[in-house]
Amino acid sequence: MKIKMPVDVRMIIDRIEKNGFSAYAVGGCVRDSLLQKEPNDWDICTNALPTDILRIFQGFHTFDAGIKHGTVSVVVNSVVYEITTFRIDGEYFDNRHPENVEFTDDLITDLSRRDFTVNAMAYSERTGLVDPFDGAYDLELMAVRCVGNPVLRFNEDALRIMRALRFASCYNMAIEKHTAQAIFECKNLLKNIAAERIVSEFNKLACGESCEYILRRFKTVFAEFLPEITIMFGYEQHTPHHNKTLWRHTTCAMTNIDPEPLLRITMLLHDLGKPMACKKDPDGTAHFKGHPKFSAVMARQILERLKYSREFIDDCVTLIAYHDVRLTGSKPQIRRVMNKIGETNMRRLLKVQYADLMAQSMYKRDEKLEKFNFACKSFDEIVKEKDCFTLKQLDINGHDLIKMGITDGKQIGETLNKMLGMVMDETLENKNSILIQKAKEINSL
């Protein structure tokens, strides 16, 4: 089995071997190559010590920040390559990092400490594929299987739970039976992992091809760091608009939208407030008036706890708050929504509403789609024609009003906003001379 390695990777391995050591491409780059995917990066393992690597690559730009764990980074043609000495990990006391590492001369020993069989393969042109744990076979089966005892692997590093789920979602892989059992058994260990690390994996998982299946099968695992979602499990919506439980609707809506973290997380949280907003008719039909507000408040709390960026949180909460706005296709209405949330979020909102609609029942679907398509058409025309929906686009500004003798700041703001509303509603033309005349009328000048 031959893998085509980049020229610079071959050069690094050749250089190490010419100095009397062995070296291999290892881990994800080997896995992706066997899957016929372009690796994001190439990692190299070797029996050379870090001091040997620093000597061998004298004259190259090197970093030794990871030298404690045996890693030296070498820069070749502006690309950073991590070269790590074969090692044995010491005991793990925090479910994340080994307390110490011990270097070894044995490749198989090094591979045995890795997380999954598909990541425990090494390759060099001299030896070919080194695969002591049948990772290539698991790749053929598209299976995620831990190296050795899965409970031990997850206790060593609980983030491996999220990595297993991410691989399954993004690579459309199955999780091997014993590995899956261990994930459920060890899920409480996720509480020991920093929010930023969980979010990094979860964002990728949420954008995976198989995220709907993974979110549904392993829902109790995700509830370890998202306990708020448990209220959606098995929650019947009792409305003709929905034929799925709230959790199934949510996961279905996620896969209906572009695989971007902001959009996928928005769909994950968009209906979280429904149980709190639920009111039922005497016949048992449920209504969820005001649920976007509940969902938005809960989403902000969750995203802040998980340490998402401020921009991400604000955009996500905005989309959730507006996701149930009934867009008629009226241009004045759409301009006013754009005024509140901006053009970029309006474009996202249309994607959110479509994903939500397509995860609902067939009840009135044609009617809903007709209105939705009309709204999209109106939005596209507003953007194309550069319609005014912000004060910045208004063909008059505060300086014009000051020249007219209006100097009070509050009065200036009220005048401009009143005229903007009229322009958005198409009752006033966005033309400087006309706006000046209207400003005089408003202020009785």
Question: What is each of the regions a protein language model found here?
Answer:
Residues 1-445:
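Catalytic cores of the polymerase beta-like nucleotidyltransferase superfamily
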